[in-house]
């Protein structure tokens, strides 16, 4: 599966547009990640616990989008965009949403 944030694929020709595909996931840190992340917030520095949660969430959302594209018979996704937001309240979760256009290229 070819993935790009660009609207075109250079020399490859888009021969069919299959439609919008999306991926969304909400991830919360484990208890250990939450404790380590909380300590890092106090002392400062790179917060690898939360960074890893965000990376994992992005990969899962992206995989969900890819699976949708495959179901449509696409072999590429163009114009991919990502968005994320943190959940407020008593949770420290992160929502990651991605979307793009599933296409067939040759």
Curated annotation (Swiss-Prot):
One Pfam family, short name: YbjQ_1
Leader sequence segment: none
Domain of life: Bacteria
HAMAP family, per database record: UPF0145
Family: Belongs to the UPF0145 family.
Protein name, entry field: UPF0145 protein FTL_1249
Taxonomic source organism: Francisella tularensis subsp. holarctica (strain LVS)
Lineage, uppermost ranks: Bacteria, Pseudomonadati, Pseudomonadota, Gammaproteobacteria, Thiotrichales
């Amino acid at each position: 599966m070819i993935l790009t944030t660009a609207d075109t694929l250079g020399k490859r020709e888009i021969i069919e547009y299959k439609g919008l595909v999306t991926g969304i996931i909400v991830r919360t840190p484990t208890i250990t990640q939450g404790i380590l992340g909380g300590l890092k917030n106090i002392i400062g520095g790179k917060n690898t616990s939360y960074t890893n949660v965000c990376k994992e969430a992005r990969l899962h959302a992206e995989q969900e989008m890819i699976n949708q594209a495959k179901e449509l018979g696409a072999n590429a996704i163009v114009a991919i965009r990502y968005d994320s937001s943190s959940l407020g309240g008593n949770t420290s979760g992160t929502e990651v949403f991605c979307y793009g256009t599933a296409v067939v290229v040759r």
